[in-house]
Regions:
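Polybasic/polar functional segments that serve as interface/processing modules
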Residues: 1-129
Length: 129
């Protein structure tokens, strides 16, 4: 039976940014604040780890939220840095609020996204603004 309250929204963001988190504590703090700012509840994490491998150097953070997960990957070797952000939730969220926060917090110079309804497939959602 279908749950009328349950939804499946997935926001995938690729951003190039000038000011990104470069240490574990900094990203962990940002993720907590970010999750709170979009009215989500953390169940586990955020778990954050810095990878020092040349060519793949950067930081990854993952949090389990009450309605699914949030992940962020930052490669800090390129200039501007590359960020990949994944927000999946079974509750409503505003993709504009998320995009604006990322743009402002990280001095984003380029941002691309896909917003999907995954309830019965991988259907793109057209944003109106």
């Amino acid at each position: 039976m279908k749950n009328p309250v349950l939804i499946h929204k997935h926001l995938i963001i690729r951003a190039e940014a000038n000011r990104v988190p470069t240490d574990e504590e900094q990203l962990q703090h940002w993720m907590r604040e970010f999750i709170d700012s979009i009215d989500m509840k953390i169940l586990m994490g955020p778990y954050v780890k810095y990878c020092k491998m040349e060519g793949n150097r950067g930081i990854t953070g993952i949090a389990v939220i009450e309605t699914s997960h949030i992940a962020i990957h930052v490669w800090d070797e390129p200039n501007p840095a590359l960020m990949q952000i994944d927000v999946y939730s079974c509750a409503e969220f505003d993709p504009y609020v998320i995009a604006d926060k990322i743009k402002n917090d990280f001095d984003v110079v380029k941002l691309d996204y896909k917003y999907l309804n995954r309830e019965t497939g991988l259907k793109p959602i057209r944003l109106k603004k």
